[in-house]
Swiss-Prot record:
Belongs to the UMP kinase family. Its main location: cytoplasm. This is Uridylate kinase. GO terms for biological process: 'de novo' CTP biosynthetic process; UDP biosynthetic process. Inhibited by UTP. It comes from Bordetella bronchiseptica (strain ATCC BAA-588 / NCTC 13252 / RB50). Catalyzes the reversible phosphorylation of UMP to UDP. It catalyses: UMP + ATP = UDP + ADP. SUPFAM superfamilies: Carbamate kinase-like (SSF53633). ATP binds at residues 12-15, 55, 59, 162, 168, 171. GO terms for molecular function: ATP binding; UMP kinase activity. Keywords: ATP-binding, Cytoplasm, Kinase, Nucleotide-binding, Pyrimidine biosynthesis, Transferase. Its EC number is 2.7.4.22.
Amino acid sequence: MSSRSYKRVLLKLSGEALMGEDAFGINRSTIVRMTDEIAEVAALGVELAIVIGGGNIFRGVAPGAQGMDRATADYMGMMATIMNALALQDALKHKGVDTRVQSALNIDQVVEPYIRPKALRYLEEGKVVIFAAGTGNPFFTTDTAAALRGAEIGAEIVLKATKVDGIYSADPNKDPTATRYARISFDEAIVRRLEVMDATAFALCRDQKLPIKVFSINKSGALKRAVSGEDEGTLVHV
């Protein structure tokens, strides 16, 4: 049985990850598989918080938002993350995982507002906490929300779940000689111009000395291995 390497982690899930093989929306088999992985990690005693994106439903920078006021489009994207958070909470509930959703936008009939002390208490009680609506402000990505919430709750690491199994020297889909980094420093990533997160999120993690691990959400058991400190994905460190 794997042991946990981290006590408290922040998991960043993209909305696109929920689509599976579908063109948009939430793929049921995909979200069930994800909740299996999350439940397995929660069972280790890891205090787990999640920031989820909304790109499977709407993105403020997507072609569909062209001609729209950027702030309005971003608020629509934030509401999409709330829909995803509720879907994830429901799926986790069916796995017996006690989960709370906190939103940076107030929709009192549906979700709790984000209140840091309450979020910390939930984590200490062993509940999974899903942070929705990004930072609550337009012009900021959910990557930035993940960095911000990770710093606020005192997470030991941000786990960024993507479609690739780490950070590569080049695009592995275009360059067969591309190699995966097992570890790389923040400064090295900047020098090599590797896109780990958007610049604001990356700078916040670096300034707060909050490491990032990039791994594939599509690999079975990858989340548990990442939490257990095994050689999974790429670790970005100070």
